[in-house]
Design a protein with these regions (language model features):
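N-terminal secretion targeting segments of exported proteins
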Residues: 1-46, 186
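Short alpha-helical segments in extracytoplasmic peptidoglycan/chitin-binding modules
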Residues: 30, 128, 148
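Surface-exposed, glycine-biased beta-strand/turn segments
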Residues: 38-114, 144, 173
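Conserved, short, structured surface segments that act as functional micro-motifs
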Residues: 58, 80-83, 114-120, 140-186
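A residue-level detector for short acidic-glycine micro-motifs
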Residues: 60, 89, 105, 130-133, ...
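Disulfide-stabilized cysteine-rich extracellular repeat microdomains
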Residues: 63, 92, 133-136, 156, ...
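A generic structural motif
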Residues: 90-92, 123, 131, 146
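Zn2+-dependent peptidoglycan hydrolase active-site motif and core
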Residues: 97-135, 160-166
Length: 186
């Protein structure tokens, strides 16, 4: 066998193993990269946010949950993840903007029901779900503490409450440490 023939065989052996190696690297490294992104997002503090419904009761925290109504997640042993907090209150209770920004979306959609998203900047956004009545429209500028909606029970909801999310760089983070007030716990 010539040196060129041996080199070709070596390349062929490597090229057959390369997809397997790439797959193994992706499977091993992707969870580490995602975990690093979540840690980085949690580390970044957007500043104190206004409690969006000051007289509501916290009924479901952020994170892994056994509630099957929540989206599936392989990251949780319970296989379900709640990407925000639920604040229960009376129907048509006021909902205030947690931060100043632009209303990116205000519409009806699936599990969130009637919802809106306010973006403070390209990295920070807040989501308000299960609304009864939005009081601002897509494109409107809002200031923190401004009345923006009335609480409802639209979408995939078990009763009147606000589903509140904070996303940093597109990733959900626990809103509780970022809120400037205290909440009643149910």
């Amino acid at each position: 066998m010539t040196v060129l023939g041996a080199a070709r065989l070596g390349w062929l052996a490597w090229s057959c193993r390369r997809p397997v190696l790439v797959l193994v690297l992706v499977v091993m490294l992707l969870p580490l990269v995602m975990a690093a992104m979540v840690v980085e997002a949690q580390r970044e503090k957007p500043g104190r946010l206004v409690v969006p419904t000051p007289h509501a009761t916290l009924t479901q925290p952020f994170g892994c949950t056994a509630l099957e109504i929540e989206p599936w997640s392989d990251a949780c042993s319970s296989h379900h993840f709640h990407s925000g907090i639920d604040l229960a209150g009376a129907i048509d209770s006021p909902v205030y903007a947690a931060c100043s920004g632009t209303v990116l979306v205000s519409r009806q959609r699936g599990g969130y029901g009637l919802y809106m998203v306010v973006t403070r900047d390209p990295r920070l956004s807040t989501l308000y779900g299960h609304l009864d009545l939005p009081l601002v429209r897509t494109g409107d500028q809002v200031v923190d503490g401004q009345l923006i909606a009335l609480m409802g029970s639209s979408g995939n909801s078990t009763g009147p409450h606000l589903h509140f999310e904070v996303r940093i760089a597109g990733l959900p983070v626990d809103p509780l440490p970022l809120l400037s007030g205290t909440l009643q716990r149910g």
